[in-house]
Regions:
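A short beta-strand-turn-helix
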Residues: 11-32
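Active-site-proximal beta-strand/loop segments in catalytic clefts of secreted hydrolases
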Residues: 36-37, 69-72, 96-97, 126-128
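N-terminal targeting signals for export/organelle localization
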Residues: 1-14, 123-126, 135, 146
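Thiol/disulfide oxidoreductase modules built on the thioredoxin-like
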Residues: 82-89, 97-140
Length: 146
């Protein structure tokens, strides 16, 4: 069965510390990639860098949102902000500082990448190997119209 993102899910916060419900951030007709990452997670950063390299090409072909949700604790949030800014990542960056959202998704490992459509998780991937981003793009493409 598809896993839905419900409105009762824990909030995440943006760069300014404003709380947001992921449920409210998702557009029904638009694909959304959610990537759970942290500053101490090398594969996470490799994945986000790899997607950054092809991001503009993806955007030309497909209309999607990308939320990079950091599971860093409060102490590491500054570092996460600096890292994301320093790399000029085009993603919307959010924080899940108590890992409540991550727990609600029932996941314990990062990087953890999801594709969401109509508030349902239609694809989920754990870990990162070079080339995984191509597979992710193909999944986006497959689900864009149907």
């Amino acid at each position: 069965p598809m896993f839905k993102i419900f409105s009762c899910f824990p909030t995440i916060s943006d760069f300014e510390g404003k709380n947001e419900k992921v449920h409210n951030l998702l557009s029904n007709d638009k694909l959304t990639i959610i990537s759970l990452w942290a500053t101490w997670c090398v594969p996470c950063i490799k994945e986000l860098d790899a997607i950054n390299d092809v991001y503009d090409d993806w955007k030309e072909e497909i209309n999607f949102d990308f939320f990079a949700i950091s599971v860093d604790d409060s102490r590491s949030q500054k570092r996460a902000k600096a890292l994301a800014n320093g790399k000029s990542w085009p993603y919307q960056i959010f924080f899940d500082k108590n890992q409540d959202f991550k727990r609600a998704l029932g996941t314990s490992y990062i990087p953890q990448t999801f594709i969401i459509k109509n508030k349902e998780i239609i694809y989920q991937h754990t870990g990162y190997q070079p080339g995984d981003e191509e597979y992710l793009f193909n999944k986006l493409r497959e689900n864009e119209t149907n």
